[in-house]
Regions:
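Mobile "lid/hinge" segments at catalytic clefts and subdomain interfaces of large enzymes
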Residues: 1-54, 216-219, 224-228, 232, ...
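Well-ordered alpha-helical segments within folded domains of soluble proteins
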Residues: 145-150, 201-207, 255-261
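Membrane-targeting and insertion segments and their boundary/processing signals
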Residues: 37-40, 44, 118-122, 176-179, ...
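Hydrophobic alpha-helical bundle architecture
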Residues: 162, 173, 179-251, 264
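Aromatic-residue detector
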Residues: 1-18, 31, 97, 101-112, ...
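Accessory "access/gating" subregions that flank catalytic or transport cores
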Residues: 56-193
Length: 264
């Protein structure tokens, strides 16, 4: 299904009644063929499809808002301590981990593998906020909400040459991949396990990162495939049904896999 507003429901217009998108694709192969035939990136194809439904100003404001909500969620999660609700007595760990990372940075003592800790702490911050009832962006779900923002924040904060001007490219690319997965398979953990949630999120993040690192459409698709492939078989078995254990840490590992997939 799709989320619709009250106004959309009242209008009585269904998705099937809308004019077709200018660039129609149902598979990654079809998307890559469009990119090759038109000499465009995945983000450009996705953007032109979106512009058939809304103005450039509305689209750009929407993309900006999505990242603002994602980034604000990271920042809140990095600042809040305490115990998560639900009865498992899970401690919020993003805040102390972030404080330790900042202290190491100030002393110029960081080990090379510390970059993995940065990726993890960004993702954990989001999923601790989710577990506490905070506002997140479903990318593609609440339980996997930390992977895409953590990967984008990692790129912005830690990769030389990264610029906020390319955030829309990252998000549009990730959205194209997420749409393909939802159309052809599932993004529901209850239906297909965590491979459908964190696996899909990792694929989306890998694609977005590969795109802003200069990857071709084929490389972007391959990055998404690698990230998804290495989540296959992952089940959805949260302790006591709460989206905490193993979900919070799993998002951190999903981010690390996304970055590795983009590099490969």
């Amino acid at each position: 299904g799709f989320v619709v507003t009250a106004e959309e429901l009242a209008s009585g217009v269904s998705i099937g009644d809308m004019a077709p998108y200018p660039h129609q694709f149902n598979t990654a192969n079809e998307l890559l063929a469009l990119c090759a035939a038109q000499g465009k990136s995945i983000a450009e194809i996705k953007r032109e499809n979106e512009l058939s439904r809304r103005s450039a100003a509305v689209l750009d404001r929407g993309l900006t808002k999505i990242w603002d909500v994602m980034n604000d969620c990271i920042n809140r999660g990095l600042e809040r301590g305490g115990i998560l609700p639900g009865g498992l007595n899970v401690k919020r760990r993003a805040k102390p981990i972030h404080e330790a990372l900042m202290a190491e940075r100030g002393l110029n003592m960081s080990a090379p593998h510390t970059i993995n800790d940065w990726m993890s702490v960004y993702a954990m911050a989001v999923n601790e906020e989710n577990a506490a009832g905070g506002q997140v962006v479903t990318a593609p779900t609440n339980g996997a909400a930390g992977v895409v923002p953590a990967t984008l924040r990692y790129w912005l904060d830690h990769v030389p040459g990264a610029t906020p001007k390319r955030i829309p490219e990252f998000l549009l690319t990730a959205a194209a991949i997420g749409g393909l997965i939802k159309f052809n398979a599932s993004i529901s953990g209850a239906e297909c396990g965590c491979q459908a949630e964190v696996g899909s999120a990792s694929a989306m993040a890998a694609a977005g990162l590969c795109a802003v690192l200069g990857g071709s459409p084929a490389q972007v698709e391959n990055a998404a495939e690698i990230a998804l492939e290495h989540h296959l078989g992952m089940t959805c078995d949260p302790v006591k049904g709460l989206v905490q254990v193993p979900c919070i840490e799993r998002n951190g590992l999903g981010c690390i896999k996304a970055v590795s997939a983009a590099s490969l």
